[in-house]
Amino acid sequence: MDRFQTKRKTYSYNGYSNNDYGYYNNNCSNVNYNNDIHYKNNNYNNNNNNNNSNSGNNFNNNNNNNNNNNNNNNNNNNNNNNNNNYTYGNNNNNNSNNNNNNINNNGNSNNNNNNSNGSENNYFQSENQSNKDQNSYFNSSYLRNPVDNYNHNNNNHNNNAFDNNNYNTQNLGDYSYKNDGYNNDNNNNDNNNSYGDTDREKYSIEKICNENDYDSVNNNNNNRNYSNSYNNNNYNDGNNNYNSNNYNYNNNNNNNNNINNNNNSNSNSNSNSNSNSNSNSNSNSNNNNYNNYGYNNHKSNNGGNRYSDDDDNVFNNNNNNNNNNNNNYNNYNSNNNYNNDYDYNDGKRANIYSRNNSNNNNNSKSGNNNSNNYNHNNSNNNGGYNNYNNGYNNYNNNNSNNSNHNSSYNNNNNNNYNNNNNNNNNNNNNNNNNNNNNNNNNNNNNNNNNNNNNNNNNNNNNNNNNNNISNNSNNNNFNYNNDNDRNNSNGNYNNNSSNINNNNNNNNNSNSYHNSCISYSNGGSNSKNSNKNNYNNQQSNANGNHVGNSKNNESCNNTNTNIEKSNKSMWDDENDYYKVQVGEYLNNRYKVLCTVGSGTFSTVVECWDTNSSGQVAIKIVRSAKKYTEDALVEIDILRNLEKTGNSNGKYLSHCIRLLDSFLFKDHICLVFKRYGLSLYEFLKKNRYRPLPLSQIQNISKQLLTAIYSMHKLSLVHTDLKPENILLESSRFTYFDNSIPLQFKNSIDTTSNNSVDHYCHLVDTDIVVIDFGGATFENTHHTAIVCSRPYRPPEIILGMGWSYPCDIWGVGCILVELYLGYTLFDTHNNVQHLAMMEKVMGPFPNSMSNVSKKYFNDYGTLNRPQNSDEIKSMERVEGLKQLKEYFHPCHDSFFDLASRLLEYQPSKRISASDALSHPFLFETIENDCFGPI
């Protein structure tokens, strides 16, 4: 139904277009898991340590035993790869201490806690200094709705990981524009607005699915000491040696508490282990989505096939390459980053978010059937921690047979215990690939762990059996990872994590429930958790289809395809659309009469409401998580807009009115009044002839009223276009030879557009629809919004955006109704800017100086160099100045249009001022069509 797709892409701009982004954290493998949570946090947590990778490793290893320091001295002469290698070697040297501590676990627990706290306090001091730098950075620009910064050394990496409300802004006149996608590295958390603690997740959820409010900070208490507990262990805390994995370092603190609690340790570790793992998955998933057009897909709901953004793709791909290199560098130095998945395209930052998923890909590529179990936590036994680790795994396997709770606890702890050992193998591969000089070191590590690998592989077999019993569905879910899918859905990683958590909840109610778009949970009612799991499983399975279709995920296609077939609901098609059956009843109330059409967001059906005995239109949203979340946002916005009506109950905002909403077979359904054609459909039916000026005047009043209502709620629609404006009814009359005199001069009676096909609207009442991409002003702003022909220049130039982007869209729509065709009909940025310059005149210096990509040093637009772009510029030459498109007697309308299409957002007319413009109140005497 849509004629073009809106590309919601995030691209690097002023702040981190090349090497700035996240590179500061690469020098310290000690805190790489901070990378998973928040790249910007790492930049500042590592400032005290990142003179080079050697010093970073020295920092951690100085806290190790003397034997480790000897190794440190030996390896300082090597390059970064060797340092990483030696770091893992030191970890192996600590195995004996760790094993001894494990043997005497109960007796040594207090001593280990004392030692752990000592190193923890020392690291807090360094961490605090880093956070001073970080705070000074964030405070250098205005913090909009700053989050809790009371203790960054404990809290930054989870609460501030979702820096949804930290925005760098620059004031452009009367408006404050977000530069999240350009100057603020916090934009890595782009989809946190979709999955995190912002308003986008809190919308009307309890009204739709009878769940609790979404709270993204839930269970983050377990993560308060996230980065600090990393150095708390430093591989010296023998009591916590099986938790030495970075990505669950919070378990060290929890386990210290467990030691104090004695018999309570198992249950506590169970919950904490899961919450840490899931939390990391969420945040890094969002980072990936942001840097790989995650929001692109979000906005593509509103698109079709009419336009494309090829130039945008090129622009963003370049920046993605920078991010890819960044990720490779991060993964190279991080203790737990598995680099094997970087054989794929597009720099998989998602590997950072879940080390188990990366291992899953490794096993998948080798065809090893252990891949499921390997990612099942207990099978991560490749190397390290010697024979005692095998015994420990066996001990945990026995526990897993006893109860699912113990199984979850032991799986996570085994995973933590073994992940560091896996680093030896994976980093050895890194060293072999990157530097032949490291071969000897790699061989030494392999020799140290050779026998252990064999023993651990045996344990893997045992763990596979136990895991298949207690967590069988988790095997599939870990294979259902989207590490290599960068161009599809926003929520792939969260969906995967959601699947993992859902299945764990089914087996183990104490697991933390992180990724549900409904609510967070720490157990509770079995039936309630089960419902949540089922609800999110469908969403996650839907995104699994995108993974299977991803070009970047070819080596995992077989696994993902199997998962799709096993988990895909029988009432959905392969693209997550509901398979509508004419005559069926939705929600035991609405009888389906016919299918009206389908878009990227939903399927629209016409139904008979058995309660009110009238026809309604029901939008059945696709079951994929990203579409479900957008629907929840839209529901909340529509309910708030309805409150803007006046006291007599008449709905004046001219926004579509929501009659009902419900969940039906894992699909959000929105019930509306049955409206008529969209403005675009009417223009098409009328063969793209212009509308009379009197009708444009009436539509202008209603459209500006709708925008004013939204802006009063601090809401930006972001996707105004004729397709998203519906007529209340489709009543119109056909003109034949009896055309009114004032119309004849405007109609070419000699063309193929015969006169008898001309349509004249009888009722011009309209409503604005499609609020799935609407954004509140105080929430995160993605870089690219608005459909291409209606996109304002500030978005193209990367200056940020706010309410004026809607005003520009209104101007484009009104001119299109006046002309009968799109004013800026283009598909790339260069041509788009050239069209604007041709129609509206040269850009002001405040805009031309922003981007050297599009403007030269003299402030004039750069001309294309390749033949395709040169050919595309030929269309620009056929355009006229805006004034030349307007009839001489329509000066008032021209004045309004030119003020709506003002270049500078700060000077662009507001919705409230536009409603007072003289054009909206004058009597139209010469009601002719369009331009002369």
UniProtKB/Swiss-Prot annotation:
GO terms for biological process: protein phosphorylation; regulation of RNA splicing. Residues 1-10 have a biased composition (Basic residues). One of its GO terms (molecular function) is protein serine/threonine kinase activity. It catalyses: L-seryl-[protein] + ATP = O-phospho-L-seryl-[protein] + ADP + H(+); L-threonyl-[protein] + ATP = O-phospho-L-threonyl-[protein] + ADP + H(+). GO terms for cellular component: nucleus. InterPro entries: CLK_kinases (IPR051175), Kinase-like_dom_sf (IPR011009), Prot_kinase_dom (IPR000719), Protein_kinase_ATP_BS (IPR017441), Ser/Thr_kinase_AS (IPR008271). ATP binds at residues 596-604, 619. CDD domains: PKc_CLK (cd14134). Residues 124-143 have a biased composition (Polar residues). Its EC number is 2.7.11.1. Gene3D superfamilies: Phosphorylase Kinase, domain 1, Transferase(Phosphotransferase) domain 1. Residues 590-920 form the Protein kinase domain. The active site is at residue 719. PANTHER family: SERINE/THREONINE-PROTEIN KINASE DOA-RELATED, SERINE_THREONINE-PROTEIN KINASE DOA. Belongs to the protein kinase superfamily. CMGC Ser/Thr protein kinase family. This is Probable serine/threonine-protein kinase clkA.
